[in-house]
Amino acid sequence: MEQSVSARWLKRYRAFFLILLLIVAIQLFLAYKSLDIVGGGSGSGFDAAEAPASPPPPHAQARVQPPARTKLTAQQLGFQPECDILAREAISALQRAKTKDCREHIAQIACAIQAGRFYAPQLRSSCPAGNHTANVSLGCFKDEKDRRLLAGYYSSSKTSNSPAKCVELCLQSGYPYAGVQYGRECFCGYDPPPKASKLPDSSCNTKCLGNAKEICGGFYAMNIYETGIAKFTAQLAATTPSEETKRVRIAFLLTLNGRALRQVHRLLKALYAPEHVYYIHVDERQDYLYRKLLELESKFPNIRLARKRFSTIWGGASLLTMLLQCMEDLLQSNWHWDFVINLSESDFPVKTLDKLVDFLSANPGRNFVKGHGRETQKFIQKQGLDKTFVECDTHMWRIGDRKLPAGIQVDGGSDWVALSRPFVGYVTHPREDDELLQALLKLFRHTLLPAESFFHTVLRNTKHCTSYVDNNLHVTNWKRKQGCKCQYKHVVDWCGCSPNDFKPEDWPRLQATEQKSLFFARKFEPVINQAVLLQLEEWLYGPYTSEYANLHGYWQSLYHHEDVHGSGDDLARSIGDSVMRLSARQAKLYPLELIELTHYLHRDQYKGFLVRYRARGSTGKPLHLETRVRPTQQGKLARNARFSKRLRNFEVSTDFDQKEQIARNFGKLLGPQSDLLLSYTLQANADSGAASHSYNLTLLWIDPLGRLQDFNELHVEDSTSDVINHSKTLLKHPITPGIWTAKLIGRNSIYAQLKFLIAPLAYYKGYPLAKSSDAEALNAGLTVALPEDFEMPVEWQQHLQTDDEQFTMREESLAKGKMLGQELHSWIDGLVGQFFQLRESCVVEADSEVSLPLCSDAPWSSLAPDPKSDVDALLK
């Protein structure tokens, strides 16, 4: 009877028993896995989004092996490497590197690492350690689950734990004490264990999983060792100097890139004083900025430009090389200075120069760097410090894992620093017998973002450790969700983060610096937002007068005829020349030479680009003119669709900045080599009580021949706030020149349509097109991106031309694609005239032959007064 009842119960509740059994099994599995934690912090407040990337932990990486190794041949590489390269990442880098020199460089380093003769395995810190001695055992101590003896850091390893390895790990992380427990566990801490917790040595009796001949604590029993370093405490900076304190002089090291000349002038105006030094490094590729800033040397005896220039890429080792070279140049100069502060064109002061000088004068000999503020082991992994990187071909190649040298503390954070002259002299002139500094220089020359860790690590491990102040004098506008989009994958084998530009809505962050020892903020870009800069300047220096000329205007060069021309200028010159011809024709002039293209913004609204050129009138006299041009794209939105009514800024462009949520091709210059994308803003649903909708849409990319070249499937969700979206194409280059159409369609309707121009090119690699074969290769554009076997949905056919129409247009496109000279110019002018509106013109010098205003009187002109960026005002 009992068996019968039991059977009935089991039968009736079988499903519940099975679920209960499954839950128990899952709990047991999770309990087992919890013992295998690789490493964890102890409430350090670490924010995973703050670091440049999220690679797997090093122990996990060591266990992952590629399924099969690819062997590279000398024929593939173009040379015979000195070893059979084994590292999977090195092989990948060699396969992707474009030049033989780069491949040889990668192979040389990979072989040296493989042979164990590249990195120093052990280094010795010279920072005073007090009475601490590495690997000295303090004994066995009783631990508690809720009150850990060493609560700084914890890791667990089933295969490699030992006292020596735990000591090495804790020392690297900056902890004076290391403890092993339960065979597999390693703990780190700042404070010595209390004597009351001492246990007999026999209580620690568990063998180490990494070395069975050694003991690694026991059950809540911990063997504790000294790591050989003292507890590190950053110096507290003084805030005000004494009356007898000598005022310091500062060397401002400006490391510049891009074409924001007026913003650089504005920064110099805010920082300038005759007693300080301004040393400027301009990226080797930025010919325009270097040429324009070179003019300052003859006007200001304390402004100099570096003659030895580097091409610095995001995360590149060349950045550290450049900084050290510039610092060495400053040391070798005749200038007297006490501190060097590195800044970029994106920095701006949040306090006056006098306040900065007062602060540094109160802290002579100290070094200001900002630490990562999180657990060191996680910082190492997130920063990629446990990887080897090689820079060549303007790319940072990851070529494999590495073990950092034992015996030193690893530190890092921001690469914006304020360093004292003695420390700068130390790092730029390493003695041959200084093994520590020599090894660190070699280590960080093959490190991602080296300037973010080099100065910190050198400070922590040398006699200069007592000068370390955990403050780099900067406030940075981090918005992790926007700034960490892997936007640098094209130049580095890693995911990177960048801070956002300050905007007026970020003003409270800037105001909050008033009572803090913060003197600079970043980033600022007037091409994105100038209003916040004006607000900051008025906060520091008082309000501008109402008569101040062109206060809300901003100009930034796009092209200049004196630049070293390359293929990067072909499109701008082709369109610029066309606008010049159209403008000159309108004024009944003969065009001579395109001089400059300049972006113009007013109150942070893009007003078009300015075309400055020379022309000749009927009398033969040369004239100098400028025309404002407004790019247009011809869009239509469905009138009756609720979705269409909420679409804004529906446009095709290139260079979409996910961080700032904007396409940086402001002039809408699109050509056969452009990587197209469509961006749009979907406004929030005005009816907050309405049901939320989602939309499944298709974006069709239709070329001038009426062919479908690509399509994107879009899934759009309603949102309570405005949302900016973008969608990229996968078109094959060269793209067919002419008038393209982007159509956003649903199942039965068209929501939006946009016609935009792909301009033909009149230049090839910096020179006017002279061969029909070159012209055809660039401008015929007969390739189709979609595969031949692609089955076109029937409902899409209505949006395309028929086969006969496509054939006719193809023949016309082929004929136009071979055009040269005047024929080519006429074709380009006919297209440019439809998509670029000539708004207004001016003349540089008055002339009776043209009835145009003077450019100096036209507030939009690049030649109009701009006193906020007039660096010559410093001479008055």
Curated annotation (Swiss-Prot):
GO terms for cellular component: endoplasmic reticulum membrane; Golgi membrane; membrane. Residues 134-228 form the WSC domain. It is found in: Endoplasmic reticulum membrane; Golgi apparatus membrane. Disulfide bonds join C83-C111, C127-C465, C484-C497, C486-C495, C842-C855. Glycans are attached at N131, N135, N342, N696, N725. GO terms for biological process: chondroitin sulfate proteoglycan biosynthetic process; glycosaminoglycan-protein linkage region biosynthetic process; heparan sulfate proteoglycan biosynthetic process. It is an enzyme of class 2 (transferase). Divalent metal cations. Calcium or manganese or magnesium. Its cofactor is Ca(2+); Mn(2+); Mg(2+). UDP-alpha-D-xylose binds at D283, T312, I313, W314, D415, W416, S498, R522, K523. Residues 1-14 are cytoplasmic. It is a single-pass type II membrane protein. Residues 48-67 are annotated as: Disordered. Pathway: Glycan metabolism; chondroitin sulfate biosynthesis; Glycan metabolism; heparan sulfate biosynthesis. GO terms for molecular function: metal ion binding; protein xylosyltransferase activity. Coiled coil: none annotated. Its EC number is 2.4.2.26. The chain crosses the membrane at residues 15-35. InterPro entries: Glyco_trans_14 (IPR003406), WSC_carb-bd (IPR002889), XYLT (IPR043538), XylT_C (IPR024448). Belongs to the glycosyltransferase 14 family. XylT subfamily. This is Xylosyltransferase oxt. The lineage of its organism: Eukaryota, Metazoa, Ecdysozoa, Arthropoda, Hexapoda.
